[in-house]
């Protein structure tokens, strides 16, 4: 059975690139362009991993992650934040979320899928 990945990013170019890379690596991929849709899809599809942008139009990715942590169905799903902001405050924000790590932008297309797999349980 293929692993499921959910990508939440409002930038269509990033979304399609990440989707293509994960599909080539064998993932079944679901996508959302805002946090609310991403939360709903996570609850419905129960992905093995979530790849989420930190800056979404309706809320920060870290806020969406905290909502997912409150739900027994989604609390243990690892989250990979993809962010251009690797400043200390952003890193601290991510460290405060269990099961969360980050990959800096721009992503490395050669290693992205491998990095995502490494963060899965």
Region annotations inferred by a language model:
Residues 26-33, 41:
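Short hydrophobic/Thr-rich beta-strand motif most characteristic of the beta2 strand and flanking loop
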Residues 15, 57, 75, 87:
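The feature encodes the CheY-like receiver
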């Amino acid at each position: 059975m293929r692993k499921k990945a959910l990508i939440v990013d409002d930038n269509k170019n990033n979304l399609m690139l990440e989707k293509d890379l994960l599909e080539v690596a064998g993932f079944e991929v679901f996508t959302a362009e805002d946090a609310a849709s991403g939360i709903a899809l996570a609850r419905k599809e129960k992905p093995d991993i979530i790849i989420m942008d930190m800056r979404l139009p309706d809320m920060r990715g870290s806020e969406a992650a905290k909502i997912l942590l409150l739900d027994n169905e989604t609390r243990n799903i690892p989250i990979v934040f993809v962010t251009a902001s690797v400043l200390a405050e952003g890193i601290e924000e991510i460290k405060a979320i269990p099961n969360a790590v980050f990959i800096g932008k721009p992503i490395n297309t050669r290693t992205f899928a491998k990095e995502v797999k490494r963060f899965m349980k």
